[in-house]
């Protein structure tokens, strides 16, 4: 459960949040000397919210729908609703990636659903960057703070993007923002799922609902509370609190660039402190 104390802390002025993110997307595209942004739309809350924000930031946006046989038909229908909301009927491509996945899996003789699921995410990343390079667009990521902290994304898959506009909003906050933006209720309330295999749900894999997950993340990593206190506040077992904390710790490598072994006086990762937009 989410304590009322945490809910109040996470409830923001979503009008201001919208204005800020839209402005930053627009600025970042300009600073990057790109002409627009491209996004992968799944029909889930994160990609729906980010697509709407992108469409408000620039008229130069493009959307890719990249389903597989494990993609629920409802997700495709929901994605089309968002495309209609952003007037993107002439700004999207529908690419079924089953043939690519099957060929890849056959070549390397893979049947493990998790490995194949990660291949799906990386194929989508490759397609997004192919279109982005062709159009001189940025790849707009859709990950939220909860997923990023938990490491609940594929390294160099859905984590392979140029910018993460909602990356500092917990899943609970993204749902609130979705309500503010007019995202259809069935999308806001839909159980989050990467849909990398049939029946997959994020909350089912993790073993907790996102309101509880977000409460644990907030209380531990923003208020630095002890696990015992967090368990009491969230009415959650101590073991589950520790599980969430450990997910953050063990996924740290996903949030960092590759390690560089220092051999000189100035190693790039540890000593390279130039601005992101340089020159």
From Swiss-Prot:
Gene3D superfamilies: HUPs
Residues annotated for deamido-NAD(+) binding in this entry: 122, 155, 162, 253-254
GO annotation, biological process: NAD biosynthetic process
Entries under InterPro entries matching the protein: NAD/GMP_synthase (IPR022310), NAD_synthase (IPR003694), NH(3)-dep_NAD(+)_synth (IPR022926), Rossmann-like_a/b/a_fold (IPR014729)
Binding site for Mg(2+): 46, 147
Listed pathway(s): Cofactor biosynthesis; NAD(+) biosynthesis; NAD(+) from deamido-NAD(+) (ammonia route): step 1/1
Principal EC category: ligase
UniProt-annotated binding residues for ATP: 40-47, 142, 171, 193
Gene Ontology MF annotations: ATP binding; glutaminase activity; metal ion binding; NAD+ synthase (glutamine-hydrolyzing) activity; NAD+ synthase activity
Function: Catalyzes the ATP-dependent amidation of deamido-NAD to form NAD. Uses ammonia as a nitrogen source.
UniProt record similarity statement: Belongs to the NAD synthetase family.
Protein name: NH(3)-dependent NAD(+) synthetase
Species annotation: Sulfurisphaera tokodaii (strain DSM 16993 / JCM 10545 / NBRC 100140 / 7) (Sulfolobus tokodaii)
């Amino acid at each position: 459960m989410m304590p009322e104390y945490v809910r109040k802390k996470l409830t923001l002025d979503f009008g201001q949040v919208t204005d800020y993110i839209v402005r930053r997307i627009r600025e970042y595209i300009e600073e990057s000397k790109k002409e627009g942004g491209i996004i992968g739309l799944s029909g889930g809350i994160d990609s729906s919210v980010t697509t709407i924000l992108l469409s408000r930031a620039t008229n130069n946006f493009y959307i890719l729908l990249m389903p597989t046989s494990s993609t629920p038909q409802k997700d495709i229908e929901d994605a089309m609703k968002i495309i209609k909301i952003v007037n993107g009927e002439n700004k999207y491509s529908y690419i079924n990636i089953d043939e690519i996945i099957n060929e890849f899996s056959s070549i390397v003789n893979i049947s493990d659903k998790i490995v194949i699921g990660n291949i799906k995410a990386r194929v989508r990343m490759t397609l997004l960057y192919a279109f982005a390079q062709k159009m001189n667009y940025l790849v707009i990521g859709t990950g939220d703070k909860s997923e990023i902290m938990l490491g609940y994304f594929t390294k160099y898959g859905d984590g392979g993007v140029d910018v993460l506009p909602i990356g500092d909003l917990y899943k609970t906050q993204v749902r609130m923002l979705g309500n503010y933006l007019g995202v259809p209720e069935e999308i806001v309330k839909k159980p989050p799922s990467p849909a990398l295999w049939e029946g997959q749900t994020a909350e089912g894999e993790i073993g907790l609902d996102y309101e509880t997950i977000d409460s644990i993340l907030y209380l531990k990593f923003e208020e630095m509370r002890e696990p015992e206190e967090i368990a009491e506040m969230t009415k959650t077992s101590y073991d589950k609190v520790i599980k969430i904390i450990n997910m953050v710790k063990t996924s740290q490598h996903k949030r960092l660039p590759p390690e560089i072994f220092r051999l000189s006086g100035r190693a790039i990762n540890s000593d390279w402190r130039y601005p992101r937009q340089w020159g």
